């Protein structure tokens, strides 16, 4: 009698891991080591599968990053304190800061037209709730989104450079007050422009 011993293909092995497992592991690598070190090969090694097995769940790295972006942005709702434009901007910032290179992941995903528009939708809805037209709300929401992403990207780069001691002595630190000032400036400017006669 013969016993046939089969080999487990990468695709079959990947079924032991769900898309959620893959995404959660990728987020851990991102948080521990940064976006530059989040490679499909490294992720596969961490999951003990062949790199090709990851494509069972995500057809390419961009789709994986889009999933990570959605998860990062999705945290904003749970971090929201209060309501309104300023509260939404702060919650998004906190969500981005929760993961190393969070702003870069979300920004690059949105630039490629991938991922959920949840961040923009929430900011736009907050502006619209203050009585602005859909067109103005969308433009203001986009402006706020770009400010938050840019500010946090700068913050996160500064934190990394500080951690390895390469920031020039006497360089001005990035602080919460700078972020609050920027959001307030956009918010007040929006209301000021609406009150000016045409």
Where in the sequence are the language-model features?
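Basic, helix-initiating cap at the start of DNA-binding domains
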Residues: 1-42, 46-48, 59-66
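C-terminal peripheral helix-coil segments that are non-catalytic and often amphipathic
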Residues: 1-9, 157-198
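Alpha-helical structural segments
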Residues: 20-28, 32-33, 46, 63-80, ...
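Key DNA-contact positions within bacterial/archaeal DNA-binding proteins
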Residues: 50-53
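N-terminal hydrophobic signal/anchor transmembrane helix of membrane proteins
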Residues: 63-95, 173-197
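Residue-level detector of well-ordered alpha-helical segments, enriched
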Residues: 64, 68, 88, 101-102, ...
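Hydrophobic alpha-helical connector segments
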Residues: 77-116, 141-144
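Hydrophobic alpha-helical bundle segments that form small-molecule/ligand-binding pockets
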Residues: 117-167, 190-198
